[in-house]
Each structure stands twice: as structure tokens, then as C-alpha cells.
A protein has these predicted regions:
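Surface-exposed, charge/polar-rich loops and edge strands
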Residues: 1-145
Length: 145
């Protein structure tokens, strides 16, 4: 797939089809924090065609969000665990949409296309390939609003 064509297709959607997968170096403290976040009911539980169930939890408590941020600040930078072409297409789509907004005189820098939704996985979970949230789940949820 041509990189520019992929970027144009995403820009036309005006929504990110799926999160970018990133891998981080796990730590026992992070495992405890995330384990506590997963004690409640998940927001989504989607089973893909391969029979794998993907669950998504929302972390709302300010102290938990702060603890996760603090742990990520101390850890090495997450690395891309996704298809580099997909990540590049997202960057390209963002640039196309930014250029369009600048031409229209409406660019503020706070548009949704300036941000990317990412999913963090412990590096040990991605050694055989990055797990991915099913394509379309994010698009569907954004389209609801």
C-alpha cells in the first residue's frame, strides 16, 4: 500500500482506525497499578475472528492516572510495536489535515488529528508480534459521539 494513499484514506475518515501499539518495559509496581485498574468491569470486551478477546479498561481515578504517568516517566521511552507503515500513515494523515485546516484559516493545534491514541503493552507480551485492538472498534466508538 502506498504511504500517501494510506494517509489520504485515514485523513478522509477523519478518525484513527485503531490505536498504535507501543511496548514499554514492565515493572512490578506498574503491574500492581494496572492490575488494580483491571479489577472493575471492562469498558469493552471484543472477541476477534481468531477467538482472542480484547478488553479495554478506563482508568478514571486521578491517583491511579498520576501513578501510571509517574511510572511511565521513570521508564525508558515506549517503542513502536506496530507496523511502521501504519504509524507513518497516521503522521501523514495528520499533516494532510493540518495543511487543510491551515488553508481554511481554522488551525489551532488542538485538533484531534494532532493526537494519536496508543495502546501500551508490556514488552514481554509483544515478543512474538504486537497485539492489536481490532480495527474498527475505535472508529465505531468515536463515531458514536
Amino acid at each position: 500500500v502506498d504511504a500517501l494513499a494510506a494517509a489520504r484514506a485515514i485523513a478522509e475518515l477523519k478518525v484513527q482506525p485503531r490505536p498504535v501499539s507501543l511496548a514499554y518495559e514492565a515493572s512490578p509496581v506498574m503491574d500492581i497499578i494496572l492490575g488494580a485498574a483491571k479489577e472493575g468491569a471492562s469498558l469493552y470486551a471484543v472477541t476477534d475472528p481468531a477467538g482472542i478477546t480484547h478488553r479495554v479498561w478506563e482508568v478514571k481515578r486521578e491517583d491511579a492516572v498520576g501513578a501510571i504517568r509517574a511510572m511511565l516517566d521513570q521508564a525508558p521511552e515506549p517503542v513502536l510495536a506496530d507496523d511502521p507503515a501504519y504509524a507513518g500513515a497516521l503522521v501523514g494523515a495528520s499533516q494532510l489535515l493540518a495543511d487543510e485546516a491551515r488553508s481554511a484559516g481554522t488551525y489551532t493545534g488542538k485538533e484531534p488529528f494532532n493526537f494519536t491514541v496508543a495502546v501500551l503493552f508490556p514488552a514481554a507480551q509483544v515478543s512474538g508480534g504486537a497485539p492489536q485492538v481490532p480495527t474498527g472498534l475505535l472508529t465505531h466508538q468515536v463515531a458514536r459521539f
